Amino acid sequence: MDPSVLLYNQLKAADPFFLLAGPNVIESEEHIMRMAKHIKTISSKFGIPLIFKSSFDKANRTSSKSFRGPGIVEGLKILEKVKIAYDIPIVTDVHEASQCEPVGRVADIIQIPAFLCRQTDLLVAAAKTGKIINIKKGQFCAPSVMANSAEKVRLAGNPNVMVCERGTMFGYNDLIVDPRNLEWMREANCPVVADITHSLQQPAGKKLDGGGVASGGLRELIPCIARTSVAVGVDGIFMEVHDDPLNAPVDGPTQWPLRHLEELLEELIAISRVSKGKKPFNIDLTPFRE
């Protein structure tokens, strides 16, 4: 059986959920290898299927002066080393159709950024790699849009797709998480993932001393969104994790501290075990009789 189909079936059958986790961006080979080692150790303790995440390029940074990563060539070499050294699947994002083919040679899951979730050419190019496609819901999109995005992948010949909630714009410089989306996105007929870290971004919400703005975030609310997501019954959790969030070069305010990863996962597993969120409630509307 095709490796992508095998992994996709494994993720669909994950109990209680699968995990996409890692630092936001590749900072160095040494750092990424160390993070992968620790995250795999923790996820293995709980028997949670892990897909290690990191980006080779942050193409939509608020400022052109901001750190973006090592680039596609060096970044993919590092991710491939992680994949081989720790025997874990990899997820990373693409920003242009031309990136899909080389990324598909390394990554097991190709992620479509939220800002690009409706870009047909990008979705089709990603789909044609045959890899699993994780589509993040645009901050500007209704959940129903994700059914169309997933269908674009399927019509390109790839049934291995999943969709990811990452918050909705709530005025300027803020996002809100609507738990109803986690249910409505099931209309896409594929696994639903909750991004519990980016959902708490405050885009361009932090003024810099030297002028300009950067994205802030509400890290302290990550457990709240995570608890809600597993109670609702999502199939997967996406979270960015860092060993030193205050000094992370990208999205530090929304990266979860590595030292608290085990503690949070333990709680989320306990919540998911008692929740019936993955089963629809059978509502009886016939008249009540004494």
Curated annotation (Swiss-Prot):
GO molecular function: 3-deoxy-8-phosphooctulonate synthase activity
Top-level EC class as recorded in UniProt: transferase
Keyword Chaperone: no
EC number: 2.5.1.55
Family matches, as SUPFAM superfamilies: Aldolase
Subcellular location per the Swiss-Prot or TrEMBL entry: Cytoplasm
Annotated HAMAP family: KDO8P_synth
Similarity annotation: Belongs to the KdsA family.
UniProt name for this protein: 2-dehydro-3-deoxyphosphooctonate aldolase
Organism: Pisum sativum
Origin organism lineage: Eukaryota, Viridiplantae, Streptophyta, Embryophyta, Tracheophyta
Name of the gene encoding the protein in the UniProt record: KDSA
